[in-house]
């Protein structure tokens, strides 16, 4: 792979797809419970309390779809949502949460890692980063895991309404991707203001299988 300038999505929006209702179809607390789908899967991964569930609810226009909590570590299983029989949206447990037993933390890490390495239908991973915190070491490890397994991913800076100066974040993302020798979309999104929702939907809609 060659290092390139960060790409910002300008493709047509995916609003037509996301007008449909998404529905919960499966949950997996261990690797044996992970289902196989014939539809393409798009996953959301990030540190605990980064806003994964809130973002999924925002783009799916359903505030009750994915369970949201202010308590880190609330999502304790992989949750799968079917969107119009076109896409499977995957909400992964958050990583980096310390206030759980080590055995539970290790179980989550194994579950996340196994899914990201082995899902046959996984087409795109959204690596969520809290705009207020920046890119942390465990975010880098996840990105390295994705690259090692040839997974396409994009960086999503969440809670963008909480920051005003984005130059440092842009520089950080640029340097981070350069060290990985990887080029991808970098977006700013906010579940509160809806900033970036249209661009994110457009990038996800690209993963739909072309009709024959």
Swiss-Prot record:
GO aspect biological process, one term: division septum assembly
Binding site for GTP: 46-53, 73-77, 91-94, 158-161, 189-191
Cofactor: Mg(2+)
Domain (EngB-type G): residue spans on this chain: 38-210
Superkingdom field: Bacteria
Keyword check for GTP-binding: yes
Keywords on record: Cell cycle, Cell division, GTP-binding, Magnesium, Metal-binding, Nucleotide-binding, Septation
Xref: Gene3D superfamilies: P-loop containing nucleotide triphosphate hydrolases
CDD domains named in the record: YihA_EngB
Pfam families documented for this protein: MMR_HSR1
Chain ranges passing through the membrane: none
Amino-acid positions noted as binding Mg(2+) in the UniProt annotation, renumbered to this chain: 53, 75
Classification via InterPro entries: G_ENGB_dom (IPR030393), GTP-bd (IPR006073), GTP-bd_ribosome_bio_YsxC (IPR019987), P-loop_NTPase (IPR027417)
S-adenosyl-L-methionine among keywords: no
A single MF term (Gene Ontology): GTP binding
Alphabetical list of NCBIfam families matching this protein: GTPase_YsxC (TIGR03598)
Role, per record: Necessary for normal cell division and for the maintenance of normal septation.
Family: Belongs to the TRAFAC class TrmE-Era-EngA-EngB-Septin-like GTPase superfamily. EngB GTPase family.
Name of the featured protein: Probable GTP-binding protein EngB
């Amino acid at each position: 792979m060659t290092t390139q300038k960060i790409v910002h999505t300008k493709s047509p929006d995916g609003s037509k797809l996301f007008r449909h209702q998404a529905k919960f179809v499966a949950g997996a607390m261990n690797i044996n419970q992970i289902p196989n789908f014939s539809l393409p899967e798009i996953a959301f991964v990030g540190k605990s309390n980064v806003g994964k569930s809130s973002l999924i609810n925002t783009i799916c226009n359903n505030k009750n779809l994915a369970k949201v909590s202010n308590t880190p570590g609330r999502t304790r299983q992989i949750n799968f949502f079917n969107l119009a029989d076109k896409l499977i949206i995957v909400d992964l447990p958050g990583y980096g949460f310390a206030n759980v037993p080590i055995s539970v933390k290790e179980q989550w890490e194994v579950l996340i890692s196994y899914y990201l390495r082995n899902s046959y239908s996984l087409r795109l991973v959204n690596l969520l980063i809290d705009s207020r915190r920046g890119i942390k070491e465990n975010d880098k490890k996840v990105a390295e895991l994705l690259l090692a397994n040839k997974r396409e991913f994009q960086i999503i800076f969440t809670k963008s309404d909480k920051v005003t100066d984005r130059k440092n974040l842009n520089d950080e993302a640029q340097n981070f991707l350069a060290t990985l020798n990887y080029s991808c979309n970098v977006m700013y999104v906010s579940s509160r203001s809806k900033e970036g929702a249209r661009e994110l939907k457009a990038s996800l809609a690209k993963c739909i299988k072309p009709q024959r």
